[in-house]
Amino acid sequence: MRPIPVKNRIGKNNIDNAKGLKGNKLIRHYHNLLKEKSRLIASSAPIEKIKNVESELENIGIDAYQRASRSGQAEGKGGDSSKILIKWIRTTPCFSYCARLKEPKDLLEIGSVSVDNKCSTCGLFRVSRIDLHSVHPLIKQQDFLERTPEEGLFTGISCSLVLNFAPPELRAKMLLHCTGLLMPPNKEQPPWLFLVLPSPCITNSRYMDEKTLHSIMIQFGFICRQKSISKKIAYYLYSYECFPMKEIDWKKKIVNDGATRNNFFIPCIL
């Protein structure tokens, strides 16, 4: 079952359809509804349309959303991705300064669903956690793109299973926004971005493969230092070593054709 398009979400039939969504599809649908509600309010849309979206959010229920979010960290679905992050931070030479220094480094966790994962308990980081819909008092409810540098800069950003949920037109903006929230680029002790995607986004996309991903990331100033791909999840750790290009442009083109391919891509015209 595909996620329900925004333009088709309003109305009783679509509310009934949403009941069948589970896991990642439910999370994506819930996030898109929150964005749709914000868009309607900002555009002074008729109150009836806003109430319809609110009704569907209530129909899904925050409890169901929270259960779906937490299930993403179950061992059978990739587990706590920050375990891999901490291992890489400790063993990758250019990032080992994070483990050597006694003062914890600042880490921003986007789409946080847990306050007791490995990055929160390892002692290496002061973790700031945000999510579109907080599931815990220590997780700030905030849209990542609305966070400002004035709120603080970070040594590292964890973006685990977040970019794939974002609308395609916002993915490049999110990567660019990461560069604005990281400490300035530094080749000796570089800030870093931990990017986690469902592996089919890389291994079974019509428009994306690992070479394409790394080529796109280079335009933002990111160099891949570690990677690991399992059947379900792809993990990447990038060092932030130079400022983004003034003009970032990467148009969609087919790299793996086939009827069974998905359409994941990061369109870049900035």
From Swiss-Prot:
Recorded GO MF terms: rRNA (adenine) methyltransferase activity
Instruction: Detail the disulphide connectivity of this chain as listed in its UniProt entry.
Output: none
Q: Where does S-adenosyl-L-methionine bind?
A: 111, 131
Cellular component annotations (GO), alphabetically ordered: nucleolus; nucleus
What EC number(s) would the UniProt record show?
Answer: 2.1.1.-
Task: Supply the alphabetized keyword list.
Answer: Methyltransferase, Nucleus, S-adenosyl-L-methionine, Transferase
Q: Which GO terms describe its biological process?
A: rRNA methylation
Localization annotation: Nucleus, Nucleolus
Q: Which InterPro entries does the UniProt entry name for this protein?
A: Bmt2/SAMTOR
- PANTHER family this protein is in? 25S RRNA (ADENINE(2142)-N(1))-METHYLTRANSFERASE, S-ADENOSYLMETHIONINE SENSOR UPSTREAM OF MTORC1-RELATED
Please give the function described in this protein's UniProt entry: S-adenosyl-L-methionine-dependent methyltransferase that specifically methylates the N(1) position of an adenine present in helix 65 in 25S rRNA.
Record family assignment: Belongs to the BMT2 family.
Q: What name does the UniProt record give this protein?
A: 25S rRNA adenine-N(1) methyltransferase
